[in-house]
């Protein structure tokens, strides 16, 4: 990636972490279909590797906005995909994909972070990874911690996430009937791959 700043990448990661952490409320639903988000999506599409994923997300948002009771339908999608058994779902936990659930805890400790008491999910929940990556990208811009240390931790986090994110995204595509979370997971997957290649 060349045109997005570390702070812009951090914002995308933080936004994705928020959307994967809980069901969307009415305010978030209005926001994702707003003109302000359309401008943000245009900026993201200026990064060629992200263009197709952002287009897919915009299409899923357009489809979502014409659904009756969109928030309730999206809540049902969230519940069906992320909170049910793994037979026809995409569980958002590293441990569901036979990954070491302790790895993210070690990475958080190394970054001087911990999970919030307000987040009632295990530490290996998907939302924790982009939240950590957001923190690391913001830290790169601040210059208070040596860039080499931050970059090493960023690479470890990306490597850990790449172990299971492709399967998670594939399961989202397979089981997300309306496609919003499938598109969201595809954007995260492409962003992670671009970020990883930027070694």
From Swiss-Prot:
InterPro entries: Chaperone_TorD, DMSO/NO3_reduct_chaperone, HscB_C_sf, TorD-like_sf, TorD/DmsD_chaperones
Example GO biological process: protein complex oligomerization
Keywords: Chaperone, Cytoplasm
Keyword match Membrane: no
Pfam families in the cross-refs: Nitrate_red_del
HAMAP family xref list: TorD (MF_01150)
Cited function: Involved in the biogenesis of TorA. Acts on TorA before the insertion of the molybdenum cofactor and, as a result, probably favors a conformation of the apoenzyme that is competent for acquiring the cofactor.
Protein name, as recorded: Chaperone protein TorD
């Amino acid at each position: 990636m060349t045109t997005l700043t570390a702070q812009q990448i951090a914002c995308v990661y933080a936004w994705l972490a928020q959307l994967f952490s809980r069901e969307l409320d009415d305010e978030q639903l209005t926001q994702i279909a707003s003109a302000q988000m359309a401008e943000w999506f245009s900026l993201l599409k200026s990064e060629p590797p992200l263009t197709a994923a952002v287009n897919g997300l915009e299409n899923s948002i357009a489809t979502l906005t014409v659904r009756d009771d969109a928030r309730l339908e999206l809540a049902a999608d969230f519940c069906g995909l992320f909170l049910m058994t793994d037979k026809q779902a995409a569980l958002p936990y590293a441990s569901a994909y036979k990954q070491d659930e302790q790895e993210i805890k070690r990475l958080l400790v190394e970054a001087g972070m911990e999970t919030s008491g307000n987040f009632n999910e295990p530490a290996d929940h998907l939302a924790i990874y982009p939240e950590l990556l957001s923190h690391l990208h913001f830290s790169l811009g601040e210059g208070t911690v040596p860039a080499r240390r931050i970059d090493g931790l960023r690479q470890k986090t990306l490597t850990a996430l790449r172990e299971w994110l492709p399967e998670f995204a594939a399961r989202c595509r397979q089981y997300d009937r309306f496609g919003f979370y499938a598109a969201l997971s595809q954007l995260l997957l492409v962003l992670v791959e671009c970020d990883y290649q930027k070694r």
